[in-house]
Amino acid sequence: MSTTSIQHFTSSFSPFSSGTQPVGMAQSQTVGLDTLAEGSQYALEQLQLSREANGASAVDGGVPNPLRSSISKPQGQQLYSDESSAQHTQNATTGFRNLPQRDQLAEARSTIRKSSNSGPVRRRISRACDQCNQLRTKCDGQNPCAHCIEFGLTCEYARERKKRGKASKKDLAAAAAAVANNGTAPTSNGNTSNDSVSSAKRHTPSDGQSTQEVSGRYDPNFDASRNLATAGQSQLGQHSDMSGMAGMQGSQQTPHSQPSLGGAIDAIHLNHFNTLNDSNRPQMSVPDLRSLQMLHPSGANTRSPSGALPPQGMNSGYNDGAYSLMNASEANHPSINQYRLGNSAENPPAPFLGLSPPAQSPGWLSLPSPSPANFASFSMPPFSSTLRYPVLQPVLPHIASIIPQSLACDLLDVYFTSFSPSHLSPQSPYVVGYIFRKQSFLHPTKPRVCSPGLLASMLWVAAQTSDAAFLTSPPSARGRVCQKLLELTVGLLRPLIHGPAPGETSPNYAANMVINGVALGGFGVSMDQLGAQSSATGAVDDVATYVHLATVISASEYKAASMRWWTAAWSLARELKLGRELPPNAPQPRQDGEPEDDTDVDMSKRNLPPLITSVGGNSGSTILNVTEEEREERRRLWWLLYATDRHLALCYNRPLTLLDKECEGLLQPMNDDLWQAGDFAGATYRQVGPQVECTGHSMFGFFLPLMTILGEIVDLQQAKEHPRFGRVFRNSADWDHQVLEITRQLDTYAQSLKEFEARYTSSLALGAGESEAAIEGSHLDHVSPSGRSTSTAGSRVNESIVHTKMVVAYGTHIMHVLHVLLAGKWDPINLLEDHDLWISSESFIAAMSHAVGAADAAADILEYDPDITFMPFFFGIYLLQGSFLLLLAADKLQGDVSPSVVRACETIVRAHEACVVTLNTEYQRTFRKVMRSALAQVRGRMPEDFGEQQQRRREVLALYRWTGDGSGLAL
């Protein structure tokens, strides 16, 4: 860009008249520096260019370097400057004050500011509100500010005003005396803890305020109390040796490296974990920090993860997400309240707290994974009054540097949100079925005890689709937060290593490290756990965490990578014997005076099923009480894994992992509405083992029976594709017998689907009284009280009928697709090439009728569920497999295709377009283009390169093969 064009550009923004320009400035330099960027480097360069163009004499060197570096920073960075930038500015000011005369360029800039009459002068506010400071947004300093009013946020100024520099000796002495009066003991090695001294060091203010601020002064008493609270929390369970602390502190040499480890807890930064001193990193507000400080009082159980938040100044984050393996047998390892940390000499607590470890150090998050033998000792500390859902207590220390506390509660709400007011149906496309009760998690006083890894995975799943402002502005925020939550989840889960935590092993654990000559101690395996029928909540939580990870990855473009997580979930579920019913509870002795018929007991505590767990084989037995809710969680988790195993066997062309034989005696999941209401006594009749009939509106009610039938078809297909025995099997009578049996199961499901529709539509339409009783009897706790109060009985009946018709449409579509899979070919290339002339056989005609029926059901689905939001995770593969025959007809017959087939093709295209909007996947976008191309040929729009079009379609479809060595959708 030439000088003339630059001058012309700057002149268009002039807020001044020519009469107000200072002498020696060009006509083009009428730009108020406040207009473009006050004190920006660009504006100074324009002044320099204009001065040279007019031949004005200037001081050699221009603006002094310190001043230039200080005024070249954006205003947001000035407002939230750190201590180094403050010192830099002070040096620049000193150097500028010692100059013999002011630079002409600075005088011109000052004159422009003084002569500005374009409007009110933009002033720096003394401090931003907590929300704007956290979101790195410009704040006007009002209460409430304009930004909080616009986005409906809570505007408050609760952050502590901090003072630059070191604390005075008087404050240090007061803090030390307060700590001594509090009874803080010295460390185990005899040295006084350095945390009490280092915690008094002052940290950089988040909003750059000076010592004397507009609305208040620095209060040493408040600062001393804050130092006391910080120092009190800094007394760790086991300290590292002094050499380790020296090594950690020695790694921080410059102001632009990591801060010292003695800092107060309020230096936790939230965003931009790539650099250590990023000025765009917001900070947590004081209420959030105080609530975290209250998590672990002195009398709390040290087993709880909530007490593991150290008071170091944490100015870093995840940089590479690497998790290295740590030797589990090390005796001397740094720990925080018995949490084993990596053996790094540089900031050992960093990986545990979601901070980035050094690139060369092992970053393994060695947290105690909940194991079958030790999770009963987990206890919740007293929760903060500001925490809406106390269930989040175990994960709060880990997510403090990632998301605000309020957003974590909102994400938990999103996880349990149902899009249907009549029947429970997860709104998130990544929640394929509810394993847990909503009320158990969201209970205000007695929530379910959960592992931190499970909670982190639930927040991660909800963050994928949440519309919270924290995740949508800027656009990169969601990806950054989700990446940190994913790394945290993996770190807390400790994949494939599920052993007892330090201090919670049995006395004979060390003796059982070697079992039958094989050393298994490093894998967390001991005789205490071998053969144990464990139902500990922590073990179930680990399996559910694997399910969350695998589901989201399966829905992405990295489908092949998801199998490692699904395999881990299936393997751990099999080890925990989730496919078996637990033994009944031992009878509990009745206390004296206790009535025989207690009608006030909690529904979830009725018929308590206590687990008898063998310990060490011959060492007797331990009786553990397992509630009916925990039993139902085990059942639902197994059946969810059972269904996804069969679903993914079709998606990825792989054999089954979980067998029907493993769950022959396992009860079917109870009704979702009764489950959420905790009415375990209402689930009287329960079927056992895999079933083939539709029983309800949920995934377990109508989709699980279809997956049972699909498992039979997958086994048949795998036998058919066997390289040695497949040809013999296809020509034997056993093949025909199995095909007839599977056809009978599909007919049974079709009949049960009709009965299900009649039961939930005709009976509801008979009368308002019966319908209202039916709706009220469903215990819809997932519907908000306002929604229940404002909706009428008639509208709820209509919603229930529509939901029932939608479920029937989905069930009908998948049933027709299973008929196609049973009779036809799975691979699209083999289907289009048709070497065996299957297109002229009777089985092709029967399969084509089912393909058209599936398309008609898809039209009903689009009517009742236009966005395909009911089950987008499962629906895609059945829509694809049901469309291959229609593509074959359009490709082979072209203009001779019947109108019903043309309508079916159009419906398939619309359904794929809706699926892409809800859950965008590459194979659906690809097949939509292929079907569009074939449909255009059917309608007579023949391209000139017809042969090339057909060849291109085959090349695209060749990516997804269901042959013997094909991997289906797993590219």
UniProtKB/Swiss-Prot annotation:
Residues 9-18 have a biased composition (Low complexity). This is Xylanolytic transcriptional activator xlnR. InterPro entries: Transcription_factor_dom_fun, XlnR/Xlr1, Zn2-C6_fun-type_DNA-bd_sf, Zn2Cys6_DnaBD. Residues 129-155 bind DNA. Belongs to the xlnR/xlr1 family. SMART domains: Fungal_trans, GAL4. One of its GO terms (biological process) is xylan catabolic process. It comes from Aspergillus oryzae (strain ATCC 42149 / RIB 40) (Yellow koji mold). Transcriptional activator of the xylanolytic system. Involved in the regulation of extracellular cellulolytic and xylanolytic genes and in the regulation of the intracellular activities of D-xylose catabolic genes in the pentose catabolic pathway (PCP) in response to the presence of D-xylose. Binds to the DNA sequence 5'-GGNTAAA-3'. The keyword Aminoacyl-tRNA synthetase does not apply. It is found in: Nucleus. The keyword Aminoacyl-tRNA synthetase does not apply. Keywords: Activator, DNA-binding, Metal-binding, Nucleus, Transcription, Transcription regulation, Zinc.
